[in-house]
Amino acid sequence: MGGNLVLKLAGELGASAPRQLRSVVGVSPAIDLGLSAAALHLPQNRLYERRFLRNLIRRFRRKVRLFPRAFDPNRATGIRSLREFDDRITALYSGFASAEDYYFRAAAARVIDRIAVPTLILHALDDPFVHITPETLAKIEANPHITLLQSAHGGHCAFLAKSDPTAGDEGYWAETTLLRFVFAHC
């Protein structure tokens, strides 16, 4: 979610971004939140969804213990999908009308065309959770401030390459690429 958040902030700031914000990087960002939530619910991704959901429910229960008057512990009972969690908990406690409202309003896709600082997005075409809609892709490609690097493989955040010890490259393609980008814009 961090990639979506930083891209959304950059889009909301647009041309008014402070000069200290020199560049932005998103690695496998869930730019279209609803699409990512739907992808997590696919049978082949249910293991990941269950893990994310278990962690979210654990965090929610911790908040209930810390702030018992602010949160209803029964809201988490029987939740079986990320979308259901977002509908019953995230939306309710974050001021959204529903999960769909949350996915729309919290998505970087809505404002990505307004990004006005050098931005790098790394995305793997075989990412099982993060898919970019054609409409969002068109916005990204039309924005001269955004560099989109898409690899055929990499899944969700597993961008590796052949290492080159003589060049100090250990095969961490994403890390090497984003550092070069950030240092080029310092």
Residue ranges and their predicted role:
Residues 36-37, 132-133, 159-163:
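Short conserved micro-motifs at the rims of enzyme active sites and ligand-binding pockets
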Residues 1-92:
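Alpha/beta-hydrolase-fold enzymes
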Residues 152-186:
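Catalytic active-site module of serine/aspartate enzymes centered on a nucleophile-bearing elbow/loop
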Residues 88-111:
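Active-site nucleophile elbow and catalytic-triad environment of alpha/beta-hydrolase enzymes
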Residues 125, 129-147, 151:
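Conserved loop-alpha-helix segment in the C-terminal half of the alpha/beta-hydrolase fold
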Residues 115, 121-123, 127:
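Short beta-strand/loop motif that positions the catalytic acidic residue
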Residues 25-27, 120-122, 149:
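Hydrophobic/aromatic beta-strand patches that form the interior of the parallel beta-sheet core
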Residues 18-19, 112-116, 139-143:
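Short, conserved loop/helix-junction motifs that constitute active-site signature segments
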